[in-house]
């Protein structure tokens, strides 16, 4: 039994050691629990501090001065604004270089002007399209400016060309000149550099001028068609006196005021939108979106116009002039009868002039329809298939819309100078007189001898030259060189 005593002593020692460990374990776990609760409290405190910091960030923008901001805070914002997720980019899960990456998206440093993209140099794949657009724009610009200026100057400086008919043609040339001179450079600059000249002002002014030009052309074609019908059915003398300026200006005012009134909603519909790009900073584009700051009644009217714009555009600026011109021509042909049945009281010269005027109206209508048809087709495609088209396709359709208007402004004066014999002859005389100094004396001598009688007959028989009862001596056609 003696061996039991060492065993009992050893068991007692082991039991004492175990009890001591158990008694000391509760404070250990309690200490750990207290440490965890303190850590959670400290974490919650840090979270509240972060929330307070975020609240301060929202109301005190000076703390974010080192990060990029939107260029126009009051304007349209991108769907994913470039805002850092933490006031300290290197902490709390943020990458240390996130601020530098966000700043690299802009083309210039804060406080400096944005750099303009130049796709022409160095030469890349996009440079070829940029060169093609510039070349086409230069050709259209040169032809349109020279042609429209020629028509306006010829009508203005020639005494016998100041009639309502020629004044309407000159007003067409004036609006085409304004569209080419002001709108074409802005559109081409935006297409090449993705930056908008004059910002929101040009986004509103360019559509207004283009729609006004279409309205002037539409109402001018209707007025010319009415004039042709009136001449065909009138019993008054075919040669009428030269109209006064007040009468001509009154007729032009009706056309201009009506066209500009119908184009006023374009000023309220368009606005500038800026979108961030990974390599080029911000991209400027014009979108159809009425401003939310408009009055409620005006905003609803603009929204109604936006919803009905496509069909209004198609009906008023495409179908109306074509149908009106075709109807007037058919009625005029019906009143006059077939071309083979000529009246004895009508001279051959007068028949030629009437045929020439009818050809002018028909030619203007055909050119107008040919130039506005692509624009209307693109509008219909964008209205119904915009969700299925890519951004590049939509941009291409928008460029086609713009160039169709510019083509109309460049082709119309060329057609007038080719079809209208008085305008074309005056243009050739002016070019000859300006380019060749000896042409002036020779033309005067020849006109004094043999061409005087021919000019008188053309003046008296053409509607372009309304000869008054007591007219001064005949003046040379064209502008004084």
From Swiss-Prot:
A GO CC term attached to the entry: plasma membrane
Glycosylated residue positions: 79, 85-86, 95, 105, 107
Residues with the Phosphothreonine modification: 479
Regions of this protein lying in the Extracellular compartment: 26-134, 189-205, 273-310, 383-398
Phosphoserine PTM positions: 471
Signal peptide limits: 1-25
Cell location: Cell membrane; Cell projection, Cilium membrane
Topological domains, Cytoplasmic: 156-167, 227-251, 332-361, 420-481
Entry's transmembrane regions: 135-155, 168-188, 206-226, 252-272, 311-331, 362-382, 399-419
Membrane topology: Multi-pass membrane protein
Region (Disordered): 26-58, 70-108
Listed GO biological process terms: adenylate cyclase-inhibiting G protein-coupled receptor signaling pathway; Bergmann glial cell differentiation; cellular response to reactive oxygen species; negative regulation of astrocyte differentiation; negative regulation of neuron differentiation; negative regulation of smoothened signaling pathway; negative regulation of systemic arterial blood pressure; positive regulation of cerebellar granule cell precursor proliferation
Cysteine disulfide partners in this protein: 203-286
Changes after translation: O-glycosylated.
Any one GO MF annotation of this record: prosaposin receptor activity
Tissue: Expressed in primary cortical astrocytes (at protein level). Expressed in the central nervous system.
Subunit structure of this chain's protein: Interacts with the PTCH1 receptor.
Function as written in the Swiss-Prot or TrEMBL entry: G-protein coupled receptor. Has been shown to bind the neuroprotective and glioprotective factor prosaposin (PSAP), leading to endocytosis followed by an ERK phosphorylation cascade. However, other studies have shown that prosaposin does not increase activity. It has been suggested that GPR37L1 is a constitutively active receptor which signals through the guanine nucleotide-binding protein G(s) subunit alpha. Participates in the regulation of postnatal cerebellar development by modulating the Shh pathway.
Family stated for the protein in its record: Belongs to the G-protein coupled receptor 1 family.
Designated name of the protein: G-protein coupled receptor 37-like 1
Protein species of origin: Homo sapiens (Human)
Gene name of this polypeptide: GPR37L1
